[in-house]
A protein has these predicted regions:
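Short conserved micro-motifs at the rims of enzyme active sites and ligand-binding pockets
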Residues: 122-124, 201-203, 213, 254-257
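Non-catalytic terminal regions with compositionally biased, polar/charged low complexity
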Residues: 3-5
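Conserved nucleotide-binding/hydrolysis micro-motifs of P-loop NTPases
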Residues: 7, 102-103, 117, 206-208, ...
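Mg2+/Mn2+-dependent nuclease catalytic core
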Residues: 207-227
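Arginine/glycine-rich "motif VI" loop of SF2 helicases in the C-terminal RecA-like domain
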Residues: 223-238
Length: 270
């Protein structure tokens, strides 16, 4: 999740060195990552400054920003040039655009997807972090790990749907709304399975071991189901299933019945 499996960066990993040694060499050695970050964008775009400004803004908001939010934050006026910047970043795979459904409206959100940029901007520019070990010992590490695992899942939708035995599906989406009682609900990923006539709520959880489904998780799942069932994006004739997508599986607990399907890291790379 540090480099996203890009062959260029993978080739720089030495098999005779530990993970920590490799990360230290690539990211924390002699300003190498800083120069690499500049070179990546300079190599892709002739006017790289504006692209880097967009990336630096998006890294502040993991779930992304709308076009109007970006323009306001960057103090720019809308127009063809800015649209071209966003389109070029999407075409290169550095960002993605997705539809966020909420209430009765939907909006296009732009989200940073480049693993190298996410790690570099989060840790390498901060003097507090001088090595991979210092990163791993920090609280922001777990936030970053959870976020990038979610991106990893989004990049492997065919494998996710195969693991869930979904034959046909329409465009997956994120959703936010409320239960009939007014409780807020934010769902990371909904997969509308057309052939199965069902909506799959995917709860994406990073864990360094088997995930332990806690009572608050079970409460969240119940709220998510209730909110989605009462939303305009859900068809009343469709069922709602919950899939836990996590790294190494889950432990048995009294809340296990809240999960219909389990997808692990192995499924993403099988």
């Amino acid at each position: 999740m540090i480099i996203g499996g890009v062959p260029y960066y993978m080739d720089r990993f030495r098999p005779d060195r530990t993970m920590a040694d490799n990360v230290n060499t690539i990211y924390f050695g002699k300003d190498r990552a800083r120069q690499e970050f500049k070179d990546v964008y300079a190599g892709l775009y002739s006017t790289s400054d504006v692209y880097i400004k967009v990336i630096r803004q998006l890294v502040k908001y993991f779930y992304g920003m709308s076009r109007s939010q970006l323009l306001k934050a960057l103090e720019k006026e809308g127009g063809g040039n800015f649209s071209e910047v966003l389109e070029n970043l999407i075409d290169s795979g550095i960002i993605r655009s997705y539809t966020l459904y909420g209430g009765k409206r939907k909006q296009t959100i732009y989200q940073l997807m480049d693993f190298f940029s996410l790690f570099y901007l989060r840790f390498c520019e901060n003097p507090e972090y001088t090595s991979w070990r210092s990163v791993q010992r920090s609280r922001p590490f777990y936030t970053w790990a959870g976020n990038t695992f979610e991106l990893l899942v989004l990049e492997h939708m065919p494998q996710i749907t195969d693991a869930l035995r979904i034959k046909e599906y329409s465009t997956p989406f994120s959703w936010s709304g409320e239960t009939p009682g007014g409780e807020g609900a934010q769902i990371d990923l909904v997969i509308p399975a057309t052939a199965e006539r069902a909506d799959y709520i995917c709860e994406i959880k990073f864990s360094e071991g088997k995930y332990v489904l806690k009572e608050e998780d079970a409460d969240d799942i119940t709220r998510h189901i209730e909110a989605l069932r009462n939303s305009s994006v859900h068809k009343p004739t469709h069922s709602v299933y919950v899939a836990l997508v996590t790294t190494f599986g889950m432990t048995e607990s009294k809340h296990r019945s809240h999960i219909n399907d389990l997808v692990t890291l192995d499924s993403l790379f099988s």
